[in-house]
């Protein structure tokens, strides 16, 4: 039994927490997981169903317009996993030394991606009206960090109640007081003209 433990211990991942700057050792484990050499590591946290609360405004629930139904938050580890899975699908082998620099180019140190799936959007043009960020609390008070970039996945479809699909937001926490193991309060505005500010909480200690 002790001999088996001695073999397994070197392959145990770090304590679970978001890695703002993914290191090579953890990247190797993410790649190994993508090739099924070890169990996959948790590289993202998903919230489904998405529990949303109102921070400001009246008559904001039910949503006066489109509504978010699912969220996913991830960092550099997810990018490494995606690159490794893409290579595997193309029957290629890649090493962490290859994909980690590319992952850091696509999603720099200290950055996160937030995926937000919507339902009931009346016009595709209204996707750009969504504003997402985080609310940070410190002893000096609170501040907001807005996503510096927003894109869309190619999963948009027209349903009976409007369009459904996924927005992707990019956030930069460089130099910000964010606990990689703690809760993160994500805030957003929808396309509605009502002054409604919504929020949901993400556990950064649930993924790498």
Language model: regions and residue ranges:
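Conserved functional micro-motifs across diverse proteins
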Residues: 18-208
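Sec-dependent N-terminal signal peptides
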Residues: 4-15
């Amino acid at each position: 039994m002790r001999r088996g433990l001695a073999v397994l211990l070197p392959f145990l991942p770090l304590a679970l927490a978001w890695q703002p700057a993914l290191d090579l050792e953890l990247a190797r484990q993410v790649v190994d997981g993508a090739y099924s050499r070890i169990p996959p590591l948790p590289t993202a946290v998903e919230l489904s169903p998405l529990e949303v609360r109102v921070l400001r405004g009246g008559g904001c629930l039910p949503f006066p317009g489109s509504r978010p139904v699912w969220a996913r938050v991830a960092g550099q580890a997810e990018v490494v996993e995606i690159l490794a899975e893409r290579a595997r699908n193309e029957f290629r082998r890649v090493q962490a030394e290859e994909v980690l620099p590319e992952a850091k180019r696509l999603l720099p140190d200290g950055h996160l991606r937030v995926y937000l799936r919507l339902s009931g959007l009346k016009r595709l043009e209204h996707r750009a009206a969504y504003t997402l960020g985080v609310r940070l609390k410190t002893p000096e008070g609170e501040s907001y960090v807005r996503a510096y970039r927003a894109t869309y996945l190619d999963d948009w479809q027209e349903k009976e109640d409007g369009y459904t699909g996924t927005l992707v937001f990019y956030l930069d926490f460089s130099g910000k007081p964010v606990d990689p193991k703690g809760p993160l309060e994500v805030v957003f505005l929808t396309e509605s003209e009502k002054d409604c500010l919504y929020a949901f909480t993400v556990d950064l200690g649930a993924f790498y």
